[in-house]
A protein has these predicted regions:
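Acetyl-CoA-dependent GNAT
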Residues: 2-6, 10-98, 109, 115, ...
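C-terminal "cap" of GNAT-fold acetyltransferases
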Residues: 3, 84-88, 122-137, 141-160
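Short glycine-rich loop/turn motifs that provide flexible caps or phosphate-binding loops at active sites
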Residues: 64, 102-104, 127
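Conserved glycine-rich acetyl-CoA-binding loop
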Residues: 96-110, 131-138, 142
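Short coil/turn segments at alpha/beta junctions that flank glycine-rich nucleotide-binding fingerprints
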Residues: 102, 119-123
Length: 160
């Protein structure tokens, strides 16, 4: 994997067409929302001037994934600890299955977090991981996210 070949760009109408071709048939929508849901969330964030972005991920000029990191809107199911200060919510992160395991996801995650911090300020980050998604659990724990006992539906909350 050559980091110089990785690019991230804001998701827009044009590049979202290419994101539909990402191979993710091994990841249930119980684990990560569909692209259509991600685009709905993205449009909501844009319309309401939320802090954050949804990014398209490219490798060698080919669209291979997307990641959504936005300022969190409080949910009734959020733990009390999250209601004390503003935070970001990572809501979707998919890498085409042909490009996993080579460091692209790790690189993109850190780059997007850093960009969000630089643009909007440092805040805690929360995300949910389905209780049966052990691969995602390992990925996030290895990147300094802490698994909690709090759950929203079938998802455990993770904080960083």
């Amino acid at each position: 994997m050559n980091k110089e070949n990785i690019n991230i760009e804001y998701v827009n109408e044009e590049n979202s067409r290419f994101l539909k071709n990402i191979l993710r048939d091994d990841i249930s929508e119980d684990f990560v929302d569909s692209l259509d849901v991600v685009l709905e969330i993205t449009n909501y964030g844009i319309e309401h001037n939320c802090k954050g972005h949804t990014y398209a991920i490219k490798y060698d000029e080919k669209h291979i994934g997307f990641i959504l990191l936005w300022e969190a809107i409080e949910w009734s199911t959020d733990p009390e600890i999250m209601k004390k200060e503003p935070f970001y919510r990572l809501m979707a992160f998919i890498i085409d299955k042909r490009y996993r395991g080579c460091g692209i996801g790790s690189y993109v995650l850190e780059k997007v977090i850093l960009q969000c911090y630089e643009e909007y300020g440092i805040r805690p980050i929360a995300l949910g991981v389905h209780k049966d998604n052990y691969r995602a659990e390992k990925f996030y724990v290895n990147r300094s996210f802490i698994k909690t006992d709090f759950m929203e539906g079938n998802d455990y909350y993770y904080f960083r």
